[in-house]
Amino acid sequence: KLTIERLWTTLGELRSMGITRIEGDLILDGSYFQVDGGFPAFEDNGDNPHAPFLVEPSAYLTNLNLMHFQVRADERGTQGCRTTAYLSLLSHEQYSASLIRSLLADLGVVVSGGDLNGVTPEDARLVMKTTSPDLVTMVRDINKWSSNVMARQLLLTIGAENRQEDESDDRVAGIRVIYDWLENKGINTAGMVIDNGAGLTRHGRITARQGAQILEHAWNSAYSADLMASMPIIAMDGTMARRLRNTGMDGEGRIKTGYLENVRSIAGFTRDSNNTT
């Protein structure tokens, strides 16, 4: 999750080394992910192909590839609340290169060349680096705010880290790893369909029994506390902040939501009158 704040801090370290000019091109390397088969098509864009939930995963991804717009009336118009929108308008490569250049310029660093995509040379010298937030933090952001692109990034990362010699698509490799893991935990995956790592699909399939088995395993696992903390709390935060308010359920469950046009779904944990989860 390379946000603008993390990127600014990282580039600031570069500037603190005394670097004020980079002779040559700004070259972005997106070769970490291999997605030879492309991504499954999703046509339900809500008449907004630039919506945040449609951002596709990429090794170039920075700041979720989003631009932030605020619209408000000046003194000539009727005063009222401002309108805020987040849109994805540029390719990952364009967005990342432009953002890096802009931040470097703000820091007083000039790049003399243009923007290119390429592979890092084997003899390149590492000057500085940054690391991702830990997995617990990433999963919390994914679940609390139902981030499709972050979930899909996670799937591709699983694939990239476990890619076999005969595999050339990290999406497919990641799905294979998940199926193998589930089967190893005793969960029958017959009929289950995972196609993109998020709920952004009309082809995904899972039975109620399979879902319940996965949740039961999660509840009894060594990482249950981390998973519980990542899920939205009824009527309190995340995607559940405004749902089931004043129903007597406030704070009484941790629920992951799902939403597509004409589809609503929830899954998670709560307690009954006998205090049973």
Residue ranges, per PLM feature:
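Short acidic-glycine loop/turn motifs at beta-strand connectors
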Residues: L64, E75-T78, R271-N274
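Short, solvent-exposed loop/turn segments at the edges of secondary structure
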Residues: V55-P57, W145, V149-M150, N262
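C-terminal soluble interaction/assembly domains
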Residues: V177, T189-T277
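A small/polar active-site loop signature that marks catalytic segments
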Residues: F69, D74-D226
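Mid-domain, small-residue-enriched loop/turn segments at the edges of structured enzyme/sensor domains
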Residues: K1-S58, N65, V109, G159-Q210
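Short, glycine/proline-biased beta-turn/loop segments that scaffold the active-site neighborhood
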Residues: L28-Y32, D44, V111-A124, I233-A235
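Short Gly/Pro-enriched turn/cap motifs at secondary-structure boundaries
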Residues: P49-A51, L90, T130, I255-L260
